[in-house]
Amino acid sequence: MYAVVVTGGKQYKVTEGDVLFVEKLDAEVDAAIELDNVLAISKDNGEFVVGKPVVEGAKVTAKVLKQGKAKKVVVFKYKPKKHYRKKQGHRQPYTKIQIEKINA
């Protein structure tokens, strides 16, 4: 059984036990969260349900494992012959979650 869920503006295909890195969620570590934007579900009997736009009554339960920041990305801008140099770094915050249960 798998589901397609939306969180942080991105879509993820998840099964029970999967570990994901998603955009930062406002939740404490070891907290249980519910992802209720389920676009599609594939059941064990081969049935495939597609929502319009979401599947009614479906939700995915997950556990927050970690809050953190990704590796630094360096942004370097320059203009040739003008002595313009600008170096900037960015670290995107993320939440590491583990999918516990898919309710269809």
Swiss-Prot record:
Ribosomal protein among keywords: yes
Keywords: Ribonucleoprotein, Ribosomal protein, RNA-binding, rRNA-binding
Cysteines engaged in disulfide bonds, as pairs: none
Record has Repeat as a keyword: no
Top-level lineage group: Bacteria
PROSITE patterns: RIBOSOMAL_L21
GO biological process terms held by the UniProt record: translation
Function (record text): This protein binds to 23S rRNA in the presence of protein L20.
Recorded family membership: Belongs to the bacterial ribosomal protein bL21 family.
Protein name: Large ribosomal subunit protein bL21
Species of origin: Clostridium tetani (strain Massachusetts / E88)
High-level lineage: Bacteria, Bacillati, Bacillota, Clostridia, Eubacteriales
Gene name in the database record: rplU
